[in-house]
């Protein structure tokens, strides 16, 4: 058995059933839950993020949920710092950190460390938003392709959050995101050669999703419709009424929120908002699958199977997590 303490990553696309399985695991294993979700960190954003209910969170606490205000930014570096601290606390209690969620960049940051990229710059971000409004996101994507074709190839023109971040990194630091990542890869290789690990845990990697992709698409559509019935629009109305939030913030750019915000701005009808929200969520799931396909040592579970708990426990036993 490894001398490093154990941890479990439970990954998967949105609407795949990660939370349900995580809770089942905590009932039979000495696990404590850590959320790995870039939207669940925000307070007062409950319906559109499909946040577990307050009653469920009271019974099965998740760390890193409801930790910042929607006006604030929360980076992958922030997550790594907070997650490592939470994992250390859980391990010190003799329990296993069980990290559950679908923000794959957070998992990657935790597992491999982060390149030394510049912090967010409000002025540069505002300039990019103005350019996008004037020229369109495709024009900004063309800019990125000219300076950083590698990043441009993996970032879609309709992904404004990642596109603006890539351009922001270049404008602030004078180096592209690809250049920063190449530096980080070299540092990681050096660490590996010296026997150092970026993450001081023995990690078991689980992923859950329906084997039939159409089932996931149907779940996404159904869940978005239920969110609207639960008062998603009213939730965004309340956020707008604060007066300090705007579509340039990461919180409001979250899938679903930006479509409802545009609807309230009169840019989309109710039907268009619902359709685009569902499409954006499906696109998110597609990106999550892309990340997951590149993840090594990943054990897949089918959401539609009735015995995923026993399958997960069997796998965890084979990788010595339960030894």
Curated annotation (Swiss-Prot):
The keyword Disulfide bond does not apply. Substrate binds at residues 14-19. Pfam families: IPPT (PF01715). Residues 37-40, 161-165 are annotated as: Interaction with substrate tRNA. It comes from the Bacteria. Disulfide bonds: none annotated. This is tRNA dimethylallyltransferase. GO terms for biological process: tRNA modification. Catalyzes the transfer of a dimethylallyl group onto the adenine at position 37 in tRNAs that read codons beginning with uridine, leading to the formation of N6-(dimethylallyl)adenosine (i(6)A). Keywords: ATP-binding, Magnesium, Nucleotide-binding, Transferase, tRNA processing. The keyword S-adenosyl-L-methionine does not apply.
């Amino acid at each position: 058995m490894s001398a490093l303490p154990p941890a479990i990553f439970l990954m998967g696309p949105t609407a795949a059933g990660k939370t349900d399985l995580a809770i089942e695991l905590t009932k039979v294993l000495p696990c404590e839950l850590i959320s790995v979700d870039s939207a669940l960190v925000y307070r007062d954003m409950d319906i559109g993020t499909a946040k577990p209910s307050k009653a469920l969170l009271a019974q099965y606490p998740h760390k890193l949920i409801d930790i910042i205000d929607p006006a604030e930014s929360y980076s992958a570096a922030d997550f790594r710092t907070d997650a490592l601290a939470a994992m250390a606390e859980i391990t010190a209690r003799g329990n296993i950190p069980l990290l559950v969620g679908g923000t794959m960049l957070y998992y990657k940051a935790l597992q491999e460390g982060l390149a030394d990229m510049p912090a967010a710059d409000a002025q540069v971000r505002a300039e990019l938003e103005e350019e996008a409004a004037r020229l369109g996101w495709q024009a900004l994507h063309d800019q990125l392709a000219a300076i950083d074709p590698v990043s441009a190839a993996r970032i879609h023109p309709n992904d404004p959050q990642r596109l603006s971040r890539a351009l922001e990194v270049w404008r602030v630091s004078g180096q592209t995101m690809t250049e920063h990542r190449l530096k980080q890869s070299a540092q990681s290789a050096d660490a590996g050669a010296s026997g150092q690990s970026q993450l001081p845990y023995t990690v078991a990697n689980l992923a859950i999703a329906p084997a039939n992709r159409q089932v996931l698409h149907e779940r996404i559509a159904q869940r978005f419709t239920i969110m609207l019935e639960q008062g998603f629009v009213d939730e965004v109305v309340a956020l707008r009424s604060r007066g300090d939030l705007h579509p340039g913030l990461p919180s409001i750019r979250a899938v679903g929120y930006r479509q409802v915000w545009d609807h309230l701005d009169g840019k989309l009808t109710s039907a268009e908002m619902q359709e685009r929200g569902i499409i954006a969520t499906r696109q998110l799931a597609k990106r999550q699958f892309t990340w997951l396909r590149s993840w090594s040592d990943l054990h897949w579970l089918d959401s539609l199977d009735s015995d995923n708990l026993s399958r997960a426990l069997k796998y965890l036993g084979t990788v010595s997590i339960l030894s």
